[in-house]
A protein has these predicted regions:
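Cleft-lining beta-strand/loop regions that shape enzyme active-site pockets
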Residues: 1-169, 182, 371
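Short, solvent-exposed loop/turn elements at domain surfaces
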Residues: 25-27, 48-52, 186-187, 224-226, ...
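Short, intrinsically disordered/low-complexity patches at protein termini
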Residues: 38, 64, 105, 123, ...
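Residue-level detector of alpha-helix boundaries and kinks
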Residues: 39, 72, 172-173, 205-206, ...
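Stable alpha-helical elements in mature extracytoplasmic
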Residues: 50-57, 83-87, 94, 136-140, ...
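Short, charged low-complexity intrinsically disordered segments located at boundaries
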Residues: 88-89, 116-123, 172-175, 317-322, ...
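Polar, glycine-rich mid-to-C-terminal structural blocks
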Residues: 136, 148-149, 153-155, 159-222, ...
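Conserved functional hotspot residues or short segments at active or partner-binding sites
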Residues: 190-402
């Protein structure tokens, strides 16, 4: 394949020959040692043979003096159950029950135990999860929770507790995803969040209400519940993305942020390492001026709420009396892009987004992930917890009943 390329920064035209071939993306986008002996492994998909890379990464980090591990399963939608079982074999003693699959017919039933001696049964572990952590990731995090082998931190997981056969061929090029069983982790719970109810209009999916969930116990006696995914031992919500940052990075069709980043790369052949890189205030000021001059606008949540309030006031008959106040508030909330970009929280989050993009360009996904840990609230809390052994161990013990 021959590509013709023109560099925006120089206007130079080039011809590049590209050889097409199958590319194997890394199973682990990034792993490495962080401050104070904390190891970090980012695992984004349970692909075939990926557990071997997790194993190698863990061994490497231990050789570097790791004192505690953060296993990041955020946004990991799962994959091969066998890979999940191999990872659990690394941390749970041989002969322990890991997983049961139960279907409506006997040949859909199966049980899985650990089959080899573990690599480590004492290393403190924090598993980071979120609402996009699903399937095999939930088997891993839920089983580690059931054996009190790790502290689960973040937000509640997706809740996919079904065993499915994908891509069953049907006539006329049809495909079917067939559910054959549910899976149950060691405490006996199924973490499936949706139940399917038969109605006159067919099957309807609905969330399992908390009142219908059941209580189970971990190996140490801690209370856990089924339904609704894996509830973390410590809930830590991520920082929210400001509206202006969302529009600049994901909605803006003029690509102001992307074009700024392209120009930045052209002007900076080399930059600091991902662990140290931060967009300077001077560089951010250049970006801000570019945004202001472009005429960029975005929808403010406060303006939307004001319109809804005005509509409600009209409906209730109060609008005419309050009209001057509404108009004054509208003027107060009027767009001031420069002011919005200078607001400290907005500025910080936009700088982080630009830095992550730049690190991906200079150092690929590995660099972007390493840089993002600098401002990752959930990772920071995980590292803090691993640095406090007494607090960590207390979380893995059952609460004293009053």
């Amino acid at each position: 394949m021959v590509l013709k390329i023109q560099r925006p920064s120089t206007g130079k035209k080039m011809t590049v020959k590209v050889q097409r071939k199958a590319i194997q993306m890394p199973y682990l986008p990034y792993y490495g040692m962080q401050k104070d002996g904390i190891g970090y492994i980012n695992y984004n998909q349970y692909l075939e043979n990926s557990a071997k890379d997790v194993r190698r990464a863990f061994i490497d980090l231990k050789k570097q003096g790791m004192k505690g591990l953060v296993l990041d399963l955020r946004n990991n939608g799962g994959g091969s159950v066998q890979e999940a079982l191999q990872i659990l074999n690394m941390f749970i003693p041989k002969g322990r029950h890991l997983l049961s699959m139960k279907g409506k017919v006997k040949n859909a039933n199966s049980n899985y135990n650990t089959t080899v001696e573990p690599l480590d049964t004492v290393m403190p572990i924090v598993v980071l999860v979120n609402e996009a952590t699903a399937s095999a990731s939930e088997i891993t995090s839920g089983t580690l929770q059931d054996y009190d082998r790790a502290v689960i931190m973040g937000t509640r997981t997706y809740g996919k507790g079904l065993v499915q056969i994908p891509n069953v061929s049907l006539p006329y090029n049809g495909k079917l995803k067939l559910t054959t069983a549910k899976y149950y982790i060691p405490s006996g719970r199924c973490i499936q969040a949706l139940r399917y109810k038969h109605t006159d209009n067919g099957y309807v999916a609905e969330n399992v209400p908390d009142s219908l969930t059941h209580e189970f116990r971990t190996a140490a006696g801690r209370i856990v519940r089924d339904g609704g995914g894996i509830k973390p031992d410590i809930e830590v919500k991520p920082d929210s993305l400001p509206n202006i940052a969302f529009y600049l990075s994901r909605v803006d069709t003029t690509d102001i942020m992307l074009n700024y980043e392209i120009d930045y790369i052209a002007a900076h052949p080399t930059v600091a390492s991902p662990k140290d890189f931060e967009l300077s205030d001077a560089d951010y000021e250049q970006f801000k001026q570019r945004v202001v001059k472009s005429g960029f606008t975005y929808d403010q949540v406060s303006e939307k709420i004001l319109k809804e309030l005005e509509s409600l006031a009209r409906f209730e008959g109060y609008y005419d009396d309050a009209k001057p106040e509404f108009e004054a508030l509208r003027q107060k909330l009027k767009h001031n892009i420069a002011k919005d970009l200078d607001y400290p929280y907005n500025k910080q989050k936009i700088k982080e987004l630009i830095a992550a993009d730049l690190m991906a360009a200079y150092y690929f996904e590995k660099g972007s992930l390493e840089n993002s840990l600098r401002n990752d609230k959930q990772f920071a809390e995980a590292a803090r917890l691993l640095g406090n052994p007494t607090e960590y161990q207390k979380l893995l013990q059952p609460k004293k009943e009053k």
